[in-house]
């Protein structure tokens, strides 16, 4: 009976909101926005951000996620010069963080799909059986990023001190997502840093955006380098000399205020080379 009930809840929650976030024990809203309750079936953190004032979209304040930190002492650990893994899924229940991982599969929805999964037609249209990943195929997935601020208090994090340090091209795609960490990323303060995950879908569905928060800390680092101030990315597909190098901000679009980019004619906003983001660790973000 319990398994039937659980499956029913999973099906209902997926239909209600089937989007994606990077799940990890160090995230805000891991168990929902009530820290007295650990909801193994929550999808609150996956919901997109659209037409909101900055006071609401910033770290998902619209749903109270900015007030729901992870358990004390739990961090997203960032091993300098190495990599870390998160789980991209529509619901916490579809990860290894709930129900002993029994509903976690190779893909974000926990279902089976072909390795060359794509929409129909030539060129392929949007994938219709799971629009939650907002893409036509893997190569057209918009890319996701992690950014870091060397502030321990979220109220002190700004667009200028939140720097993208890792890019994973052609994601979201499969559930397991591994991001590279710059070797020179310095240690965090004793209370840790604040990190953010970002994604702007490249077409296929509403042109919204995603941002989630994490308590994080850099491990295995003795670097004394400092991060440069994050600059606004610039579309540079037609002229690479126009690309913004070095430390960059997350992409913000289609909000009521606080936007830093707009979609170019006949193209998309995305974390890719067209916007100056190279895949992997961002090793040029230091002063």
From Swiss-Prot:
Keyword Oxidoreductase in annotation: yes
Cofactor: Cu(2+)
Co-factor note (free text): Binds 1 copper ion per subunit.
Gene3D superfamilies, A to Z: 2.70.50.70
Glycosylation sites: 33, 83, 137, 238
Similarity-based family: Belongs to the polysaccharide monooxygenase AA14 family.
Protein name (Swiss-Prot/TrEMBL): AA14 family lytic polysaccharide monooxygenase A
């Amino acid at each position: 009976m319990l398994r039937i009930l659980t499956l029913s809840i999973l099906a209902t929650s997926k239909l209600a909101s089937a989007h994606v976030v990077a799940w990890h024990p160090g995230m805000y809203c891991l168990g929902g926005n009530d820290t007295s309750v650990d909801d193994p079936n929550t999808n609150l953190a996956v919901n997109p951000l659209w037409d909101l004032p900055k006071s609401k979209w910033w770290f998902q304040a619209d749903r109270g996620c900015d007030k729901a930190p992870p358990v004390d002492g739990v961090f997203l650990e960032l091993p300098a010069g190495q990599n870390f893994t998160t789980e991209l899924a529509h619901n916490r229940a579809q990860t290894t963080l709930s129900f002993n991982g029994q509903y976690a599969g190779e893909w974000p929805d926990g279902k089976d799909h072909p390795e060359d999964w794509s929409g129909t037609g030539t060129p392929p249209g949007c994938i219709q059986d799971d629009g939650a990943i907002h893409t036509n195929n893997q190569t057209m997935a918009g890319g996701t990023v992690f950014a870091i601020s060397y502030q321990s208090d979220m109220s002190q994090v700004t667009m200028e001190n939140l720097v993208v340090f890792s890019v994973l091209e052609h994601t979201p795609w499969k559930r397991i997502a591994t991001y590279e960490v710059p070797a020179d990323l310095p240690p965090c303060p004793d209370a840790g840093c604040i990190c953010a995950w970002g994604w702007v879908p490249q077409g296929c569905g509403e042109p919204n955006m995603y941002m989630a928060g994490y308590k994080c800390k850099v491990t295995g680092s003795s670097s004394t380098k400092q991060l440069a101030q994050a600059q606004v990315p610039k579309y540079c597909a037609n002229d690479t000399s126009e690309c913004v190098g070095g430390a960059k901000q997350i992409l913000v679009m289609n909000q009521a205020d606080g936007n830093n980019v707009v979609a170019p004619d006949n193209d998309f906003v995305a974390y890719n080379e067209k916007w100056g983001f190279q895949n992997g660790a961002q090793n040029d973000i230091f002063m």
